[in-house]
Structures are given as structure tokens and as C-alpha cells.
Amino acid sequence: MDPKLETEEAIGRASVVIDCTPSGVGHQNKERYYHKFDDKVKGFMAQGSEDGFGVKYARGINDSVLKNGDNQFIQVVSCNTHNISCITNTLALDGHGPENLKEGRFVCVRRANDTSQAGGFIPAPAVGGHSDEMFGSHHAKDASELFATLGYELNLFSSAMKVNSQYMHVLWFALKTKEPTNLNEVKDRLAANDLVAMTTKNMTSTVYSFGRDHGHFGRILNQTVVEI
């Protein structure tokens, strides 16, 4: 496909710009192009790798940051941050408020690379480090900053590792809440959230395959998939 417009011409004609470029390029584009058009374009969005691009956002969690046009630059958080935030919001915060969560602990078991990537695969599981003394890996830190847009200060901590697979990520979590709950209530809360998918499949490959066959353009657009 040959481009019909030069970069600045295309940006100037847009109402909203969604930046899907590789890691780091979004920040470069912001400085090189986007600031030139911030009086014409309603909003600029970048993906999870572009930390600091703009206010963090995840659908259904902090939709208020999109209202009134107060935040022109938006960072849609990563898939793992969506996963952590969706689980935390659905099971601990929704209907109770931030004071209900005593602590949240997470382990992100990440895929080695994407099926579309030729490089970066690893032959064996690899343990990730903790880059932040308070939050552990950046995943909990990002989730904390997402909830901070609502004025919440949550006790979250995450660790991460990669496994030699190309199919999706897996999240282990433990939430301590002030209000008592039970298994049936947890299942009901998950089922009531349209952004949560429930499945009886317990392998990432079979979940991935089902999404490829039946998802929107072969994609799973839910924020998390829970095996029951």
C-alpha cells in the first residue's frame, strides 16, 4: 500500500491520532510532529510501551480522564497492566471503593515473543527483576499510576517472568480485601463484566486458537480471560 499523504498532512487532517509505532517511536513522534498540531487535533493516543506519553487509560476503569477534553495525550496501558487493573477493579474496588483493597500481589508469566515476531524467542523460562522497590516490576507501578488518575493510592506489587511460548500471558494474583467474599461472588463479578471473558479452556494455545477462529478479526479484545 502506497501512502497518499505526507506525515504532517495526514496528522493535520485527523481528528484523533492513534500511534501504533514500535517502542520509543511514539515519544519521538510527539516531539517531532504532534506538538505542532495540538491546537487542531483533538487527541493523540499511544500504546503501553510509551510510558510518560500522556495520562494512563484503560477502558471501563478511568473513563473520566477522557471527558471534557482535559487530557489531549493518552497512553493506553499495556496488556499486562490491563490484566492487573481489570482484575483489581472487578474483584476488589467495584462497588466498594479503594479502601476495600488491603493489598494486591501479582506474578505476570509472559510469553517470550509475539507470533508475528521472528526474533526474541527464548529457549527456557527466564526470571525478571524488580525495577521498583515499592511496586516490584513495572506492571504494578503502571497499574498504580492508572488508578492514581482517580485519586486512588493502592498497595500493589508484581513480579514477572518469561516462558518459552508465543501464546498470550498468564497472571497469578492474590487480593486481600476488607469486605468478605466467596467463590460464587467472585465468579458473578467476573461474569458481570463485559470486558472479562470466561472459559473452561486451561491452555493458552487453545484460548488463542479460539480467539483466532471466533474473535473480532481473529483477536481477543477482552481485558482478561479467566478459566473456571
Regions found by a protein language model. Name each.
Residues M1, N100-I228:
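C-terminal substrate-binding/catalytic lobe of Rossmann-fold NAD(P)-dependent oxidoreductases
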